[in-house]
Structures are given as C-alpha cells and as structure tokens.
C-alpha cells in the first residue's frame, strides 16, 4: 500500500506519552530490559524540563532520588552531572530527616536527558501529540496522535504532567497551554473520559524569572554549596562543587503584602470572579495565599540560578497568578529586587488528573489492562515524586510483558512505596507531596541506606548490575560483623581514656566498658575515639551505617518489631475474596473496599472509612 508504514515504525512493546521526569524513567526502564519502547512528546527541546524550580531533592524528595537510583533510574546520575550548588539539609537533626537538595543547570539537565533517551538502545524518541487511547476488549493496544498516526503496543504509560486541558492564568488573562510555551493535550482528556476514567482538576503555579543583571545581590544573604563532597547516585563519585553559583536569600515586607492585597480583586483565585475553582498544593502556596492565610510580617524568598550560562533567576517562594502589573510592583519592594526586570511572568496553571484510586499499586489501571499512569496525572506534585512513579510504572509494564513478578514496594521499605500506597489507598483531594511525616518508619528510610533497602529489587528486575548488588550484600554482612566486634572491644578505666572523654564533654569512666557503649553516647563519634580500637574501621560508608545503628539502636529495633507486625498484615492476601459474602461489613466499608480493591489486610486497614470492626469481620471470614 502507498501509505503503509514499516512495521518497526508502528509496533512497539511499550509506548510512553510525555517526556517529563516521569516519562523519562518510564521509558528507559523497559528499553533497558530489552523491550522496544516509543516515547512521544509535543516538544523535543523540553525533555526532562524543570518548568518550576531548577532544583532536585529536598526533605523526603532527596531520599526518593536515591531510591530511584538504586532501582535503576536515571534522575540521580543526571543531577550529579548537572548540579551547580548542592547542600545536605537538616544536618543538625537526626539521620531520618537528612536529605540532599541540588540546584541544577536546567538547560544542561534537559539536554543530557534528551541525549540519554536518544542514545538508549531499543528506545525511540519522537514528536507526537497523543489524542486517543486505543482499547479493545478491556485492553490497551495503542495510541493515535493529532496527525491521525496510530501506534500499537502491549502497554501504554501516560505521564502527561500539567498538559491535560492545561490552562494558564495571569490575573484575569487566560491561555490554553500545557505550560508556558507548550501545547495542551485536549483530546486525550476526552478519550480517557470516554473510556470511563474519572477526571478532576488541580492547579499549581510558578514564580517570575528575572534578569540576573537587574538583581542587587549585596542586599541578600549568600548561600554557598557545601564544602563536603556530595552525590545523589550510588554510582557517582562524590565531589565538591566550585562556589561560583550561590543561591541568595531575601524577604518580602509589609510594602510587598500591601500591593498583593490591593491586587487581590484581580486575582483568579481571590477576585470577585473566581476563575480558578480547583485546589492547589498545600505545601507550596502562592504568595497571595501566604499573605491572606498567614499573619506574618515577611516571607522568605530564595533567589536561585537556572543554569551556568543562564541570565535568569528563579524566585522561590513567590509563585503567583496576580496580573503582571502587580508582579513587577511587588517584586520591586523586596530588598535586592528594587530595579528587577522580569523575563518571564509568574502564572498559575489548571489541569486534569485522574482519581488514583482507579489504579493498582503497580500503577496499572483497574479499568483498562496494560494502561499505566505516572506523575502529576495521578494527582501528585514534584519532579521526584513523578520520576519515582514513572520508574515503577515502566518496570511493571515490562514485568507484565515479560511474564515476571510485578514490583510493589512496601511502605516499610521506601518513600516511593509510601507515595504509591497513599495514592492508591486513600486517593487525593489536593496535589500530593511526599513528606518525612508520612513515613511510619522514617528512621529506617534514610538517605544513607537506600541501597541497603532496595538493591535487591533493582537487581531482581534487571536494572542494576550484579557487582553492585554483591557490594551491598557484602556491606550488610560487614555492618553486622563490626557491630558484634565493637560489643566485645574492651575499654579499661585509665587516665588516657578519661582525658579523651573529658575533652569531648563526656562523663569519665568509673569502671571498664565496651567501645560499643561509648559510641552510644550522642556526643561521641567513632573518629573521636578511634585510637581505642586496635582494628580501626576506615570505610566511611560502613562506619556511617554502624554509628547510626549504635546511636539509634533502641528506636531502630522498636521500628523493626513494628515492621514485622505490619508485614504480617501485608502478607494476608484478600484480593480474590468476594466482599459481598463477608457478613456484617458496614455499607461504607463495602463500598470503599470495592472501589480500592485492596491487595492485603494491611492495605484495607489504611482505607479511610474502613473500621477495625470491618477488618475483624474480613479476617473472621478468611479464617472460616
């Protein structure tokens, strides 16, 4: 036929829609596992783009990046290659809340991710605005783009970000867009609704970008990169960055707030005509939200570089949808921004998302077999949350095609597991953001032990090398051996020992003890007393794990006991029981259980509206 296309141009194993942080991981995983993968985007020049803050990581999110890395993802490596300022956060607090946050060169990051996609074997990156999902007999079999070109696949992964019927707001002015400068995807929303998916609207926003030469940095507080070597990836060599791209801190003031209040009448959120009806992110409010809801004299503004060679700076903390006139006036009341020039205005964007209760924990749709969802389309916010979902969706699409066991991460072993469990068990009523407070066992889910927790899964699915997995196993073995050894290293009472302890502000010994017991003291580190150990530990990674365990042993052991109970409930499979036959279930519980379709008793216990009495009835039914 004259218009017939070659088979290899039409047929793929996996199709990924969208090249944001979720789409990249969703496409690389199956391609690396040997499956022919197509990834479609409306803008080939914005692959892996950072449309909001030019940063990766932060509390909880930085740990997610580490988890992505050890499961075989790419985000950590590319961040290490393109970061221009990096800091370990919460160093004055316990290890559970420490996390890396890096400013990236967003242009270099995007180009590097594009190169990685285009150089990956089994992967095709192509322009395409997807308008329709192809479904037959309850199974997905492909997509159709805006040119009427159809592609066939065994699995489709939607990672559409803010593009589904995206609409931008600057004051009372509106524009249809996936983000500033990009086309929205309108047909795809209709296709999903026609299939039977429930869609709702969320909103988010981004601040102005301003010209570097118009900023007076002398009125701001400088924040340099860390002096210690840092890396997100377990496969990168930690490095100290040059201090030539600092971030800067300034503050709003009452003049700023007065201008914001004066212009609220023109706000699409607070004006007489409320153009935006949808809910925005609780943990990243707009500046007008802050001024209206919080009675404070000032708010922090972090002024962040967007790249090594970029003349644009990002104003973290000043997201707004106020009209342009309000934006320029309020910025010029802020110290250091008195003569600022706006390069790109701030805006809010409203977009469609699906109810994530329509998904299994594999991120496959309950409605259509082989159709997966990841990222903001599931009601989440954040690059890291998106990338984590994308990786899990990509792995599970591949596992399904290859006939292998799916990857379902537990709450007790990863932040990605918490994220997906919350989405698929509780749903969302606002853009979801990961927080350390969402973790029941956060002392077990640390920045420093992501590889110990998850390497077995990365290796099992085939995305991390054998040598790395064996290295992790060896580390685990050595941690146990060294802890037992330190329990037996004797420290006698002596003037030498007590002099060391007094200098460290620690209580002198009255009787002999073990080195292990000295290390339990919060004011003492191993390096302080290493001369008391005849077999000195020189491996920094090994030493870090040992010290954390010894100092927090009581808390860690208590959590491990709680995890055992948690996993007992998680192991009771209820996915195949007929809920209509379970006696004495409340009507609400029966409805919620049918909607969520929990995999286990443990998941059922976390569904809002399901009571302990309902759980007892299910257990009683199973035991009979």
Curated annotation (Swiss-Prot):
Binding site for FAD: 18-23
Keyword terms, alphabetized: Cytoplasm, FAD, Flavoprotein, NAD, tRNA processing
Cysteine disulfide links: none
Biological processes, Gene Ontology terms: tRNA methylation; tRNA wobble uridine modification
Recorded superkingdom: Bacteria
SUPFAM superfamilies in the record: FAD/NAD(P)-binding domain
A molecular function (GO) term: flavin adenine dinucleotide binding
GO cellular component, one term: cytosol
Reported cofactor(s): FAD
Keyword NAD in annotation: yes
Gene3D superfamilies in the cross-refs: FAD/NAD(P)-binding domain (3.50.50.60), GidA associated domain, C-terminal subdomain (1.10.150.570), tRNA uridine 5-carboxymethylaminomethyl modification enzyme MnmG/GidA (1.10.10.1800)
Matches recorded under PROSITE patterns: GIDA_1, GIDA_2
Stated role: NAD-binding protein involved in the addition of a carboxymethylaminomethyl (cmnm) group at the wobble position (U34) of certain tRNAs, forming tRNA-cmnm(5)s(2)U34.
Cross-referenced PANTHER family: GLUCOSE INHIBITED DIVISION PROTEIN A (PTHR11806), PROTEIN MTO1 HOMOLOG, MITOCHONDRIAL (PTHR11806:SF0)
Protein family according to the UniProt entry: Belongs to the MnmG family.
Name recorded for this polypeptide: tRNA uridine 5-carboxymethylaminomethyl modification enzyme MnmG
Species annotation: Thermosipho melanesiensis (strain DSM 12029 / CIP 104789 / BI429)
Encoding gene per record: mnmG
């Amino acid at each position: 036929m004259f218009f017939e296309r070659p088979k290899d141009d039409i047929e793929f194993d996996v199709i990924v829609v969208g090249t944001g942080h979720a789409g990249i991981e969703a496409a690389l995983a199956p391609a690396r596992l040997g499956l022919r993968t197509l990834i479609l985007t409306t803008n080939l020049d914005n692959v892996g783009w950072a449309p909001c803050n030019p940063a990766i990581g932060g509390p909880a999110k930085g740990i997610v990046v580490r988890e992505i890395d050890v499961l075989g993802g790419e985000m950590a490596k590319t961040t290490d290659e393109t970061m221009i300022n990096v800091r370990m956060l919460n160093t004055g607090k316990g290890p559970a809340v420490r996390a890396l946050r890096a400013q990236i060169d967003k242009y270099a990051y995007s180009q590097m991710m594009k190169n990685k996609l285009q150089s990956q074997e089994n992967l095709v990156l192509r322009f395409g605005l997807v308008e329709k999902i192809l479904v037959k007999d309850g199974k997905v079999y492909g997509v159709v783009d805006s040119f009427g070109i159809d592609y066939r696949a065994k699995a489709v992964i939607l990672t559409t970000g803010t593009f589904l019927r995206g609409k931008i707001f600057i004051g009372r002015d509106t524009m249809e867009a996936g983000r500033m400068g990009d086309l929205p995807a309108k047909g795809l929303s209709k296709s999903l609704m026609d299939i039977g998916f429930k869609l709702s609207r969320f909103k988010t926003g981004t601040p102005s970008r301003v010209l570097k030469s118009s900023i007076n940095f002398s009125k701001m507080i400088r924040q340099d990169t860390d002096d210690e070597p840092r890396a997100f990836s377990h496969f990168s060599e930690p490095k100290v960055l040059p201090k030539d791209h600092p971030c800067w801190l300034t503050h709003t003031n009452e003049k700023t707030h007065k201008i914001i209040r004066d212009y609220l009448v023109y706000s699409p959120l607070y004006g007489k005509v409320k153009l935006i009806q949808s809910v925005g992110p609780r943990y990243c409010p707009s500046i007008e939200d802050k001024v209206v809801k919080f009675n404070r004299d000032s708010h922090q503004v972090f002024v962040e570089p967007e790249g090594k060679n970029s003349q644009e700076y990002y104003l973290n903390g000043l997201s707004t949808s106020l009209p342009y006139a309000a934006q320029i006036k309020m910025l010029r009341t802020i110290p250091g921004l008195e003569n600022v020039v706006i390069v790109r205005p701030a805006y809010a964007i409203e977009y469609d998302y699906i109810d994530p209760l329509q998904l299994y924990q594999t991120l496959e749709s309950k409605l259509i077999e082989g159709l997966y969802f990841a990222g903001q389309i599931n009601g989440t916010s954040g690059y890291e949350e998106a990338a984590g979902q994308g990786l899990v969706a990509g792995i599970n699409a591949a596992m399904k095609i290859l006939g292998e066991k799916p990857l379902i991460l537990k709450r007790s072993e990863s932040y990605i597991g918490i994220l997906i469990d919350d989405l698929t068990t509780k749903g969302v009523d606002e853009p979801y953001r990961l927080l350390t407070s969402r973790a029941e066992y956060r002392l077990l889910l640390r920045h420093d032990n992501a590889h110990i927790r998850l390497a077995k899964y990365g290796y099992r699915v085939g995305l991390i090398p054998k040598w790395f997995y064996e290295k992790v196993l060896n580390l685990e073995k050595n941690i146990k051996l060294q802890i037992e050894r330190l329990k037996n290293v004797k420290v006698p009472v002596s003037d030498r020992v007590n002099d060391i302890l007094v200098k460290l502000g620690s209580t002198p010994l009255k009787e002999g003890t073990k080195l292990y017991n000295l290390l339990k003291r919060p004011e003492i580190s191993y390096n302080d007393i290493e001369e008391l150990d005849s077999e000195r530990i020189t491996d920094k990674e090994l030493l870090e794990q040992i010290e954390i365990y010894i100092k927090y042993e009581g808390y860690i052991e208590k959590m491990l006991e709680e995890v055992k109970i948690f996993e007992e409930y998680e192991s009771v499979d209820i996915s195949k029981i007929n809920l209509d036959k379970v006696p004495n279930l409340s009507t609400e519980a029966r409805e919620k259980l049918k909607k969520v379709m929990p995999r286990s008793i443990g998941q059922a216990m976390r569904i809002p509206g399901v009571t302990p009495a309902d759980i007892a009835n299910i257990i009683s039914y199973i035991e009979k």
